[in-house]
Curated annotation (Swiss-Prot):
Its EC number is 2.5.1.114. It catalyses: 4-demethylwyosine(37) in tRNA(Phe) + S-adenosyl-L-methionine = 4-demethyl-7-[(3S)-3-amino-3-carboxypropyl]wyosine(37) in tRNA(Phe) + S-methyl-5'-thioadenosine + H(+). Changing F248A: Does not affect activity. PANTHER family: TRNA METHYLTRANSFERASE (PTHR23245), TRNA WYBUTOSINE-SYNTHESIZING PROTEIN 2 HOMOLOG (PTHR23245:SF25). SUPFAM superfamilies: S-adenosyl-L-methionine-dependent methyltransferases. Keywords: S-adenosyl-L-methionine, Transferase, tRNA processing. Pfam families: TRM5-TYW2_MTfase (PF02475), TYW2_N (PF25132), TYW2_N_2 (PF25133). One of its GO terms (cellular component) is cytoplasm. S-adenosyl-L-methionine-dependent transferase that acts as a component of the wybutosine biosynthesis pathway. Wybutosine is a hyper modified guanosine with a tricyclic base found at the 3'-position adjacent to the anticodon of eukaryotic phenylalanine tRNA. This is tRNA wybutosine-synthesizing protein 2 homolog. Pathway: tRNA modification; wybutosine-tRNA(Phe) biosynthesis.
Length: 448
């Protein structure tokens, strides 16, 4: 048995359980040893006390070694004359407590044990700074930006991330920051452990490969991806103005049966992922990628549908969306928007002035489906779902009328716009909702 035991990095990186340091003594001294270690907050409750082949007992302790002063105390005061040595348990057995804990609890146990082993006092502040949730992409875990912010973590080195990864059963770690405000939607993600950020995620049978340090992936959009996948788009040409890595382009191609998609994207890293995702899903021959600013897109008079999947607002893309719609038959716009729904908010508070509201609602040359009582009907004349919030409805009506104006400006003749559906996607806060407006746009028949 060895007096000084230190867990090596090789053992941590092997993927096997980390060896645990234990104090070995005779069975009849076990209870006194346990009580002392518990009083000193050195007893490892995550692993079981083990019986050794020679009949002695090993009590697991926290940290990478146990200072000599505690060994002397155990030998001379706690249990005078007792044999007391350190050893390693190469395959420690989890205690019943550890086996029954959640991943977050297991993380707390592992990290607190490791931190105290480095001579840093564990505190409520550090515990509160641990993550409670995360995104898992295969063997990579993406942590939220609001964890591991305390200054104490910065001095603990890369072994901290090895401990976190081992506790949560992954090999790579990354930490999310705020999305870049430059319009490319590049996430400020830092790779904490591992040599690359490429991951693969499967949604509804569609494979998405991307670099988490360069591209976004929203699990919350799955309901909308499932919805558009269920649409019948056979023979249709689509324009996706904010394609990203293929969030909506791929469901339309793979499941909805779109004939062709023009995918616009200006983040070069997303374009690399998009091109790869089109290939691995077998639809590359039905999609053309347009790299660059979609406001400079040269396409026109081509689309049966346009996807405007940018939040908080896709308004900058509305003119080009009108431009690419087919002039003879029109088409459908799928417009994403974050809408505030604070009690008492009116349309003006949502960014629509009273003057604009009056101008939009009563232009002589525009036909919309707004009714005198303020309700809106779908394409079959049925009322929209009562679950639709008034703020969603007001925003949809204002968007409907504004786009009718844009269509006339772009095409030089009146168009009819009609709200088909308002789809909630997710909530970002108690009063901020991500919704999708399905808006039908058709040129008015010529008179005479």
């Amino acid at each position: 048995m060895r007096e000084n035991v230190v867990v090596s990095n090789m053992e941590r990186e092997s993927g096997k359980p980390v060896a645990v340091v234990a104090v070995v003594t005779e069975p009849w001294f076990t209870q006194r040893y346990r009580e002392y270690l518990q009083r000193q907050k050195l007893f490892d409750t995550q692993h079981r006390v083990e019986k050794m082949p020679d009949g002695s007992v090993a009590l697991p302790v926290l940290g990478e070694t146990l200072p000599e002063q505690h060994l002397q105390e155990l030998r001379n005061r706690v249990a005078p004359g007792s044999p007391c040595m350190l050893t390693q348990l190469p395959d420690p057995v989890p205690s019943k407590r550890a086996q029954g804990c959640s991943p977050a609890q297991k993380l707390c146990l592992e990290v607190s044990r490791w931190v105290e082993g480095r001579g840093v006092k564990w505190s409520a502040e550090l515990e509160a700074d641990l993550p409670r949730s995360w995104q898992r992409h295969g063997n990579l875990l993406l942590l939220s930006e609001d964890c591991f912010q305390a200054k104490q973590w910065k001095n603990l080195g890369p072994e901290l991330w090895e401990t976190v990864a081992l506790a949560l059963g992954v090999q790579r770690l990354a930490k999310r920051g705020r999305v870049s405000p430059d319009g490319t939607r590049t996430p400020a993600v830092t790779l904490l452990l591992g040599d690359h950020g490429w991951v693969e995620h499967v949604d509804n049978g569609i494979r998405y490969k991307f670099d988490v340090t360069q591209c976004m992936f929203s699990f919350g959009n799955i309901t909308e991806k499932l919805r558009v996948a269920s649409l019948s788009c056979a023979g249709e040409v689509l324009v996706d103005l904010y394609a990203g890595i293929g969030y909506f382009t791929l469901p339309f191609l793979v499941h909805a049966g779109a004939a062709f998609v023009h995918a616009c994207e200006w983040n070069p890293h997303a374009v690399v992922a998009l091109r790869n995702n089109l290939e691995i899903n077998g639809v590359a021959d039905r999609c053309q990628i347009h790299f660059g600013d979609n406001r400079k897109l040269k396409l026109s008079n081509i689309a049966d549908r346009v996807i405007l999947g940018l939040i908080p607002s896709s308004e900058e893309g509305w003119p080009i969306a009108c431009q690419v719609l087919r002039q003879d038959a029109g088409g459908i716009l799928h417009i994403h928007q974050n809408v505030e729904s604070f009690p008492g908010k009116n349309l003006q508070a949502l960014g629509v002035s009273k003057v604009e509201k009056e101008h939009w609602l009563y232009p002589q040359q525009i036909t919309t489906n707004q009714w005198k009582n303020g309700a809106t009907r779908d394409s079959r004349g049925k009322m929209l779902s009562p679950a639709t919030k008034p703020e969603w409805q007001r925003w949809a009506e204002s968007a409907e009328t504004r786009i009718a104006t844009l269509l006339q400006q772009v095409h030089g003749k009146p168009w009819k716009t009609q709200i088909l559906h308002i789809q909630p996607v997710k909530s970002y806060a108690p009063h901020v909702d991500h919704i999708v407006l399905d808006l039908e746009c058709c040129p008015c028949p010529s008179v005479g």
